[in-house]
Amino acid sequence: TEKQHVKLDTELLDKYIHYQCDIRDIGQIENIFSTYSSDIKLIIHTAAQPSHDWAAKEPQTDFTINANGTLNLLEATRKFCSDAVFIFTSTNKVYGDTPNFVPLIEMDKRWEIDPKVSMMSSLHISYGTSMAGVNENMTIDKSTHSIFGVGKVASDLMVQEYGKYFGLKTGVFRGGCLTGPAHSGAELHGFLSYLVLCAVNNKPYTIFGYKGKQVRDNIHSYDLINAFNFFYENPRCGEVYNM
């Protein structure tokens, strides 16, 4: 946001350079990458169109930002700084509605994965679940992803492929409920931040499903950045991590 841009400019001075560009514009992207070339050591790709509703209304806009924009960044990395580490913030939406079919058991304050699921081999292969959570073996096939989800699947797979096919150091981090300082939450995403906003302003908060009990876990941005740093220090080609 503009507010964060001004804050970074003020606090970091000449250590921070801001470029306002559209990741769909390969010319703009290549101009930036060619300026710094092999001096670029790390790319953290967080640019995206995040709204499911907007994606359904403007599928072409959504796909060109999330899928084509990611491809532009990958190509620029391959062309100008192929030894750099490329980190992509993907989403659990690549799994579509498959997580909705994972057997859950109701606890006092939340829903947990049914322990029996890890003992059922057919479910374990399909769902990639255990009491520890959901791993990367969960299938992305035969599910309804939403228009937004399909664009993210395409970009997710492309980041993996550039790692495995071209040998780039690419890591895909599939986030779920992310939160942290200055999180601009809204009703349809960033629910924990939005819940606090409603509480502070004494506004009603609408709860959807599951009897108001928690299903998914939140992860703090501090922990996510730590995961990024671990990958940067020990990169691999085309790896995927559920966060």
Segments and roles (model prediction):
Residues 34, 48, 200-201, 232-236:
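Residues at helix-coil transition
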Residues 77, 163, 199, 231-232:
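Hydrophobic pocket-lining residues that define ligand/cofactor binding sites across diverse proteins
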Residues 140, 213-214:
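Catalytic Tyr-x(3-8)-Lys segment
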